[in-house]
Amino acid sequence: MLAALYYVLKGDPYKALKEDLESLKKAKLLTEDLRITEKGMELIQQLISKPISLKGKVVSGDGEGRYYLSLEGYRRQVREKLGFDPFPGTLNVLLDPTSTEKKSTLMFKRPIILKGFTENGKRYGEVLAFPARVSGVEAALVIPLKTHHPPEIIELISPVELRKALKLKDGDEVEVLVY
C-alpha cells in the first residue's frame, strides 16, 4: 500500500525514492544504513500530529469526479468512513511547487481507504482519503490509486459544493488543511 501511495504522490517511484533518501540522509534524519535517527523520529511525530497545509489555485476538472461520486459504492463508504454524504463532484486544486513537495508527507498520515468495488460488471479502484478543511469547510482530500491527474493536482470532496459555498472560481487561491 505504501508503495502505491508513494507512486501516486511522487510519480516515478525509483527516482523520487532515491532523491528523498539522499535528502533525508543530508538532513540527518536517516543514517547511511537507512535507520531513522532520533531527529527523524521527532519529525515523524510532528508530521503525524499536525495538519499539513497545501496551497494552490482552483482549476476546472473534466467532470469525472461527478460520475464517480454518483456511484453508490463510493457514496456509501464516504458516508460510513468520512461521516458525510458527498456532493457529487470534486474541487480540483493545482498545488504550488512547495505544496506539491509537501504532498509527499501525506504518507505519514493514516489514510481512510475507500475500497474498490464492482458495479454493473465494471471494476472501480481504491481511493485514499484524508480528512481536510478548506477555508473552514469540512472536506476530504481524495487520491484515487488509478488517476490521470499529475501529482500537482489534488481533488477534494465535501458535503457541499465547495465552489459555491466558498464563492470560488478558476485561479482563486485556496489553502487546504489535511488532518
From Swiss-Prot:
Keywords, in A-Z order: Flavoprotein, FMN, Kinase, Magnesium, Metal-binding, Nucleotide-binding, Transferase
Gene Ontology biological process: FMN biosynthetic process; riboflavin biosynthetic process
Free-text remark on how the cofactor is bound: Binds 1 Mg(2+) ion per subunit.
GO MF annotation, one: riboflavin kinase activity
Residues reported in the UniProt entry to bind FMN: 147, 155
Pfam short name (any one): CTP-dep_RFKase
UniProt entry tagged with the keyword RNA-binding: no
Pathway(s) annotated for this protein in UniProt: Cofactor biosynthesis; FMN biosynthesis; FMN from riboflavin (CTP route): step 1/1
Enzyme class: transferase
Name of the protein: Riboflavin kinase
Lineage summary: Archaea, Thermoproteota, Thermoprotei, Desulfurococcales, Desulfurococcaceae
